[in-house]
């Protein structure tokens, strides 16, 4: 079930570590939350739209979810391969765990060398 309150709360919880994107000269064009589901296993998607970039290695984009105490309760990553990246991509992260929507207080997104 999609609830506007959960979508808004999760979207507002996203923090982008801009320094890591700037290091690789990647422009984050847009991001969002999609398909919030509070079934038996709660899940949602985080979407990132990226452009440009100057790098000569594979990059790993990481999404970490934190609880109200600041503990990491979930992590997911996607790799962008230097050989296939043409200057634009949309990355989709599936975040799923028991009560993950209710437990997530902050979401941090960053990029590192792969």
Task: Label each residue range with its predicted role.
Residues 69-114:
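Short, solvent-exposed, Trp/other aromatic-anchored flexible loops in extracytoplasmic proteins
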Residues 45-51:
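Short edge beta-strand/loop segments characteristic of extracellular beta-sandwich folds
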Residues 1-42:
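Transition segment at domain starts
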Residues 56-62, 74-77:
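Short, hydrophobic/aromatic beta-strand segments
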Residues 51-56, 68-72:
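Short, cysteine-centered beta-strand-loop-beta hairpins and adjacent loop/turn segments enriched
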Residues 63-67:
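Conserved aromatic beta-strand anchor motif in extracellular beta-sandwich/beta-rich domains
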């Amino acid at each position: 079930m999609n609830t506007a309150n959960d979508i808004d709360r999760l979207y507002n919880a996203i923090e982008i570590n801009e320094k890591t994107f700037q290091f690789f000269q990647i422009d984050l064009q847009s991001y969002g939350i999609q398909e919030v589901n509070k079934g038996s296993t709660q899940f949602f998607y985080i979407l990132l739209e990226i452009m440009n970039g100057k790098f000569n290695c594979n990059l790993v984009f990481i999404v970490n979810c934190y609880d109200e105490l600041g503990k990491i309760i979930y992590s997911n990553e996607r790799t962008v391969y230097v050989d296939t990246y043409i200057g634009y991509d949309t990355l989709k992260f599936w975040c799923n765990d028991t009560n993950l929507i209710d437990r997530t207080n902050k979401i941090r997104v960053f990029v590192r060398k792969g």
